[in-house]
């Protein structure tokens, strides 16, 4: 497991490929939500530029709005420390133009914020 968030929602980001030409990481993203008799699960692959990853971590460390997006704007993870909210969304379009979209919003307490911050700061960067 490369990056794992377990509170307030389960999100796993595993690196499956690296591109040194355009510094970027291909992540296998898994999001699992289970509460109040509701269950949703998302599994997809997304390319994220290393610069976007660094900016996301930097903003989190400064207590600012932090946004992690893939290169196609199909995946987004937003940590808003002022509002105390974690938002996520995943979208995939098939070859016929059909779209599947999953998204969620979760309240964050201080422990969850610190756990997310630790998970991203502990990721060993190669760039």
Where are these regions (language model features)?
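Core segments of alpha-helical transmembrane spans in multipass integral membrane proteins
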Residues: 46-53
């Amino acid at each position: 497991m490369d990056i794992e968030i377990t509170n307030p929602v389960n999100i796993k980001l595993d690196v499956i490929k690296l591109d040194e030409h355009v510094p970027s990481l291909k992540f296998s993203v898994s999001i699992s939500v289970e509460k109040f008799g509701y269950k949703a699960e998302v599994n997809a692959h997304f390319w994220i530029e290393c610069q976007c990853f660094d900016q996301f971590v930097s903003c989190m460390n400064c207590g600012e709005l932090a946004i992690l997006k893939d290169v196609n704007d199909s995946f987004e993870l937003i940590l808003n420390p002022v509002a105390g909210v974690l938002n996520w969304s995943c979208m995939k379009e098939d070859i016929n133009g059909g779209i599947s979209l999953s998204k969620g919003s979760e309240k964050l307490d201080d422990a969850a914020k610190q756990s997310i911050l630790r998970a991203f700061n502990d990721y060993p960067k190669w760039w």
